[in-house]
Amino acid sequence: MKSLKLILMVAFAMVGFSAMAQNINYDDPKYAKWGANAEQRKQNMLNNQFLKEAVDNKNYKAAAGYLKILLEQSPAAAQGIYTNGIKLYKNQINRAENDEQRAMFIDSLLYVYDVRLQAFADHSKYGADYILDRKV
């Protein structure tokens, strides 16, 4: 009987925590860097998660699509966008089938560094010096 009560308490606690986690107010100013309105912010935050998952799963075509959207709509939202973008293009460079593809991916990688430099040049730890050092 005690174990049943314990199991029920844990189950109710888990349901309560999951319900709390879903109530994000995207109109909150702290999410402004993710987009122009609440719907765009929500979608860009999801795109950031999809980008990470696509890179981790080596689905580079999908990852490139998510990265493009994030760089256009919310370039200053998170450093992780650039970390995943750099990972994406470094892997694409290594997998390039010819010199033309390799040059295209190198150009894309340099573009990611340039946009990161514009968005995070004044970051205390990962600012301009760090970015330029990695770009070389």
Question: What name fits each language-model region?
Answer:
Residues 117, 125-136:
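Extended amphipathic alpha-helical interaction segments
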Residues 107-110, 114:
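Generic structural signal for well-ordered, non-transmembrane alpha-helical segments
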Residues 1-28, 86:
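Bacterial Sec-dependent N-terminal signal peptides
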Residues 20-84, 88-107, 122-130:
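N-terminal leader/linker segments that initiate helical-solenoid repeat arrays
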